[in-house]
Amino acid sequence: MRIDLHTHSTASDGTDTPAELVRNAAAAGLDVVALTDHDTVGGYEAAKRALPAGLTLVTGAELSCRLVLPPSGGGGSGASEDGAAGVSLHMLAYLFDPAEPELARERELVRDDRVPRARGMVDKLRELGVPITWEQVARIAGDGAVGRPHVATAMVDLGVVESVSDAFTPQWLANGGRAYVEKHELDPFDAIRLVKAAGGVTVFAHPLALKRGQCVPESAIAELAAAGLDGIEVDHMDHDEPTRARLRGLAADLGLLTTGSSDYHGSRKTCRLGEYTTDPEIYGEIARRATGACPGAGPGGGARGPGGAGAHTAPGEVGRGGREV
């Protein structure tokens, strides 16, 4: 069974529509795919309507978070009064109730901040001599949630950088980079609490992706685990083999699940659907822990999880509070 738990559509910063994404997932030989657009579940219904036979769709989102660290660099769950530094991170949330009001409100706050943030990055790039315009970025984003990848794509189109990845450097858009602009982000401890309250499961995405900027220290990951974090994403394109081995050891020490995922964005990045996958036993445990929503199977039913512990449902099954998921 092939399982990819980290993908993006045009509902955020991918290039595949939700319908195209699930069709491409089936064509890639996947049995299970999670749609984890940034801070939104807006693409889920369209993906569900287009779900091919034999493919299971997992409700998900990639939540934008910021961990405040004390000046010493240790972990911590709250801001210090003397201006502690913060580290941006992404929290994958699975099988939560999308209608849970507090979590929905936080996702909306993050989304509302995306346009002014992207405009700020455009302004900084123009100050650096890049002939980029807001109209160009908005056109690239279309109906999606505008973000750094759209700005990066504009930079590629202008010939400023060769690839989207090349824009995510300290010279340009990486965390703390010359054209970087902060945005509203959840405290990760709050994110864990809110997702759990909505019946979901949390996995820390690409925790040691050094090319993206400063990473969260392992001491802070231990604190997140103590606060209820379920797992960490280990097999990811931004982790080399030594990093993956290090993360597997950390997960074993902390009792965390380990996942693997493509972080697929369509043509915007080079990664392919199913390039990295999650072990079926791990996926089964994620499904068993979740109470907020159930994976949805395409016509003919989806793949069965280990032991069949209620991990998959027929289309139209209702989740928490009677809401169809």
What are these model-predicted stretches?
Residues 52-222, 277, 282-293, 301, ...:
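Extended substrate/RNA-proximal surfaces in nucleic-acid metabolism proteins
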Residues 1-87, 172-174, 186, 192-193, ...:
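An N-terminally biased module of ancient metal coordination in phosphate/nucleic-acid-related enzymes
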Residues 234-305, 316-325:
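C-terminal appended segment following the main domain
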